[in-house]
Amino acid sequence: MRDFQSRFADRYNQITNSYSYSSSRQGLITGMVNVGSFFGCLLSSPVADKIGKRLSIIVWTTVYLIGIIIQVTTVPSWVQILVAKIWTGLSIGALSVITPGYQSEVAPAIMRGAIVTTYQLFITLGIFIAACINMGTHKYSHGTTAQWRISIGINLLWGIITLVGIIFLPESPRYLIAIGKDDEALKIMCYNNDLPLEHEIIQTEYHTIKSDCDAELAGGPARWPEIFNANIRYRTFLGMAVMMFQQLTGANYYFYYGTQVFRGTGMDSPYLAALIPDAVNCGCTFGAIFVLEFFGRRSPLIVGGIWQYICFFIYAAVGDRALYHKNGTSNHRAGAVMIVFSCLFIFSFSQTWAPAAYVIVGESYPVRYRSKCAAVATSANWFWNFLISFFTPFITNSIGFKYGYIFASCNLTGAAIIFLFVHETKGRTLEEINTMYASNLKPWMPHPEGYREFGREQNNATLKSHIGLNGETTELIENTDNQGDSGSFQTSTPDDSRPEQNQASATYIRPDKREPRL
């Protein structure tokens, strides 16, 4: 957009009467929002733990609105744009952690995966709407700030919708139980599930959350160094790796620099060319809801990584070898091939890596560490997002479309990481997931039924310890000693001669509790 360039670009060509950016300024303007998002992720955990996720969303949305206002009112100072982007990024990063967590805690268990996937769906919808707005405003007459102020200012609408909408939504039941408001939490759970209080689903979920909160209260809030202790370190680094490779798939190479990328393919309207993959991205994300619920998490990530490797390799090869004729003109057929494989890449990404990475992170951590581990994992995502957005202009100026070979190899590596290290979490309870990661089972090996049964026994024992079974109390006792490679489940019956110990107890002796070392 010429008016935006005339205000913030650092290069002017008198011959062509055009403005352009140096690689450093373009990288900074594009990438500084990710710097703010990185720190916003880390700030999200203490704020949410203190005031709850619902109120946190209100606070961070207000921060977001202030950042947009600063951008819209910018005078010809690119430094103000950078500061405003960092400020806005703080809220975006925090909300990228809090919002999926809020969704997973409020949603009925049977719909949890699908509802969390809508987070990514609305991200893609926002990208598509932004592309449409850019398409409509870039032809505004030169000299008017409407070209870019409308594109930025429209974001105020989404912030206001979020701010008003969250007022009518309930607080997370988990947070309410943690602060002792159990009755209010139960009312919300009954309303969200459309079930009566005495229903087994409500009682099971309530007592599971209650036991989790009691355990967290007994151990105290997790401190940041604890997420790198031996018992959780494996999953902490694994979550960071999954979110890192979500960025290294190269999707944002298209979304950030789509107009520049497709201008090189010979398209007359680069804005229209960039709109095509955005539309594919938005439309195909609807399929992710069914893909993740039907095929799980591991398989879509592995297949998606391989698919995306093939697409990026062909894209890079055509761009490097066939896009330009010897006289320097564009080969439009080669350009069309590149756009097709860009769309095929996004078709896969929008249904696999885009939503599944967030679902994996949301399902993999024990309750006590969840908020901090999710914050660190998501901050890794924003950190690599910044590196890609900042260095892409330098790299493309140096090696052109060969850049795609790097992303192709990263897609293949990401698929290998998922195959080797990530367990399937679909349909498993938190206790089952903890058991899988604490055992020596390999993710690609069949899981013995005993490990799933142990997770169920833990849930049942937790429930019985609260509501009683035939007038008695059942208590689960976990043996923390290493008992070898196999596990067993032992029970003891009440001793009538000792009334003070007249309770049933169950002890599960399981494999090595330590998580695999990286």
From Swiss-Prot:
Extracellular face residues: 49-54, 99-112, 171-236, 293-298, 355-374, 424-518
CDD domains per record: MFS_HXT
Keyword Repressor: no
InterPro entries: MFS_dom, MFS_sugar_transport-like, MFS_Sugar_Transporters, MFS_trans_sf, Sugar/inositol_transpt, Sugar_transporter_CS
Domain of life: Eukaryota
One Pfam match: Sugar_tr
GO annotation terms (biological process): carbohydrate transport; hexose transmembrane transport
This protein's record includes keyword Transmembrane helix: yes
Similarity-based family: Belongs to the major facilitator superfamily. Sugar transporter (TC 2.A.1.1) family.
UniProt name for this protein: Probable high-affinity hexose transporter ght7
Originating organism: Schizosaccharomyces pombe (strain 972 / ATCC 24843) (Fission yeast)
